[in-house]
Amino acid sequence: MRALSNLFYQRRTLTLLLILTPPLLWFGVVYVGSLLTLLSQSVLTFDDMSMSVVAELTTANFAGLLVPANLDIVLRTLGMAIAVTLGTVLIGFPMAYYMAHHASPTEKGFFFVGVMLPMWASYIVKAYAWTVLLAQGGVIYWALDALGWRGALQAVLQLPVIGGDTLATSNLGRFLVFTYIWLPFMVLPIQAAIERVPANLLLASGDLGGRPLQTFRHVLWPLAFPGVVAGSIFTFSLTLGDYIIPQLVGPSGLYIGNMVYTMQGTIGNIPMAAAFTCVPIVLITIYLAMARRLGAFNAL
């Protein structure tokens, strides 16, 4: 036993290899293997007559993604992912800044609990709870009626992009649910990035005559930007792949996740479902490459 211990001590590379081999094998089999299986299925043929997969190679599935109806699904999903990411930044950055530079230890603890609280409940429970909040007769409509703002809401809901008779059937309602659920994934990376910004830099900017907006633009934002990008990795990718919220909240119109579920679970067109699944993979890969160049991984 001592001889074996001495061997591992003297040969650190061998020790490291033995430690890393099991997780790397698991990663290779489960993750890389599943991706290769996905790619292999995306080039197979689906026979509409027999409703079965035929082992004939084709690129028709990827060409089918460019059909206007399918392209609309991709653009709809991408637009919501971008909107949710921007929304979480606008809400999360002030919260993260206060937590990092102004909150007392007790206040910071309360903020952390408040930010993390949505993650303690089941995802399905949160989504269903929002359908109740957004429905006619829900708390939000009750508050708007009390303030006399219901007419203003109805005017907003008539806008083409917002669309919907009520909040529960509008893109605005869907956006609110996405933003609420993914907000913790944006706040925490930004807060970690801002905490690394020395307070002396902000004070020095003010001493040199910099106005608050100038200090934010030229000092705080560039230094906190990697944290913003790190948080956006989560919000962007999670929105791209989600299919529960689009089913529960918002107007009719499929997202990528819904289309994959329909193609595979209802129709049985696995090759087309695999081709649709490749879309968020490609988008997220491009986004991760951009995030890495911006130094976002240092803020994770």
PLM feature spans:
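N-terminal signal-anchor/first transmembrane alpha helix
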Residues: 1-40, 108-114
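C-terminal transmembrane helix and the adjacent membrane-cytosol boundary/short C-terminal tail
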Residues: 2, 7, 191-202, 206, ...
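Membrane-interfacial helix termini and adjacent extracytoplasmic/periplasmic loops
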Residues: 5, 9, 127-179, 213, ...
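Interhelical loop and adjacent transmembrane-helix boundary motif
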Residues: 10-15, 49, 62-69, 246-292
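Cytoplasmic-entry segments and transmembrane alpha-helices of multi-pass inner-membrane transporters
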Residues: 16-20, 95-133, 202-203, 225-226
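Transmembrane alpha-helices
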Residues: 22-31, 86, 117, 180, ...
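Short membrane-interfacial helix/loop motifs at transmembrane-helix boundaries
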Residues: 31-70, 137, 250-251, 263, ...
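Transmembrane alpha-helix signature in integral membrane proteins
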Residues: 68-101
